[in-house]
């Protein structure tokens, strides 16, 4: 059985995809999101940086943002949503945070000077990838953070999930974010389930997430070749063969 830890809406979509491929899965959503700002005010002459689907979805709800707003985005799905909504000034779509840093270093600095932009407005959740944020601030470009949402995390496993782990029914656990990986490990320690989880194969969306698990003593860990759900499902097929 595969344990899905994504927020409920995304978890249901993934469960449906896995069911179609013949996989049995169980949902335990480690987190849920809550929008903080009802009205989004984007700073004039700043480049908007969107690094998650959730931030992109909230950004797209605003009716007061120009379709010519300069945008940098991480993730092909987010880019597609922006394109469909009519935003035609996407400066770059990166596959992950490292690729985005590469674009900023090699190309955005020149664009920033030519277009006379005032800085980068990083639209994100309350919790962010601190390593990425640190790298983002190392260039001579002002960076302003705008928090669009916050994540609420579960404080314990529910009874069904705990029993599935204790009975070693869970064979694979998928983790899509560093925050969820840390929360999963926290709950495992709290419930004293470390030994039961040693047999679980952890499949993650990135090397950074895998590193968190390996640092906690778990060695049955792999990450998708590309940071997207399609690549993760392809990797899953190799694991459960």
What are these regions (language model features)?
Residues 1-241:
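Signature of uroporphyrinogen-III synthase
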């Amino acid at each position: 059985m595969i344990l899905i830890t994504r927020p409920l809406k995304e978890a249901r979509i993934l469960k449906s995809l896995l069911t179609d491929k013949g996989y049995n899965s169980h949902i335990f959503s480690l987190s849920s999101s809550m929008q903080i700002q009802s009205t989004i005010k984007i700073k004039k002459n700043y480049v908007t940086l969107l690094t998650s689907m959730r931030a992109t979805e909230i950004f797209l709800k605003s009716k007061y943002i120009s379709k010519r707003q300069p945008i940098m985005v991480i993730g092909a799905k987010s880019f597609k949503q922006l394109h469909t909504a009519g935003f035609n000034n996407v400066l770059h779509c990166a596959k992950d945070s490292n690729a985005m840093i590469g674009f900023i270093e090699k190309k955005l600095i020149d664009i920033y000077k030519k277009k006379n932009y005032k800085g980068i407005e990083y639209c994100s959740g309350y919790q962010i990838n601190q390593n990425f944020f640190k790298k983002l601030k190392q260039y001579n470009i002002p960076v302003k953070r705008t928090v669009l949402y916050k994540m609420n995390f579960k404080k314990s496993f529910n009874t069904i999930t705990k029993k599935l782990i204790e009975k070693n029914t869970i064979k694979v656990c998928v983790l899509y974010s560093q925050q969820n990986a840390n929360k999963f490990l926290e709950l495992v320690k709290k419930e004293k389930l470390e030994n039961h989880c040693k047999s679980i194969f952890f499949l993650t969306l990135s090397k950074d997430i895998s590193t968190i698990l390996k640092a906690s003593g778990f060695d049955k860990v792999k990450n998708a070749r590309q940071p997207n759900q399609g690549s993760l499902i392809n990797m899953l097929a190799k694991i459960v063969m």
